[in-house]
Each structure stands twice: as structure tokens, then as C-alpha cells.
Amino acid sequence: MEYQNRFKDNLKELRLEKNLGQVELAKAIGVSKGVISMWENGLREPKMYYLILLAKFFNVSIDELVGIN
């Protein structure tokens, strides 16, 4: 899925902009580091619930998070 490629890149970029490790982000939204790693490597897609949490955490829209212009 094309949005998945944009999402994984956007997620990693947003995380690094905040100087967060995968463990810190995982704790902030209630998932494991492995889940963050799978999302960032495009091995798994987040459920809508986590997209909402991530968008709120990074103060961006879901559209921005998944790369919909």
C-alpha cells in the first residue's frame, strides 16, 4: 500500500525530530518497541486507534502522518 511507505517514513522522521528513541515513543503510546520497529520498517500497519494516538502525540493530522496531501 502506497500510504504505508509514506507512513513509515513520516513516523520515523517525526520521531527523530523529537529526538525520541523507539522505546520512548512506544511507552508514550502504549505499544512495544517491536511494534514501532515494524511500523517504521513497513512490516505492519497501525490500527486507526494508534494512528489517532500518534497524530495527537506529534500534533499532526492523520492525513499528514500517512502522507495524504
PLM regions: where:
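A short, Lys/Arg-rich alpha-helix, primarily the initiator
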Residues: 1-17
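Residue-level signal for the short linker/turn that defines the boundary of a DNA-recognition helix
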Residues: 9, 19-20, 46-49
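Alpha-helical residues within the helix-turn-helix
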Residues: 16, 27, 56
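Short alpha-helical DNA-recognition segment
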Residues: 19-38
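A secondary-structure capping/hinge motif
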Residues: 35, 44-45
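DNA major-groove recognition helix of helix-turn-helix/homeodomain DNA-binding modules
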Residues: 49-64
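Phosphate-coordinating loops and pocket residues in cytosolic domains that bind phosphorylated ligands
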Residues: 67
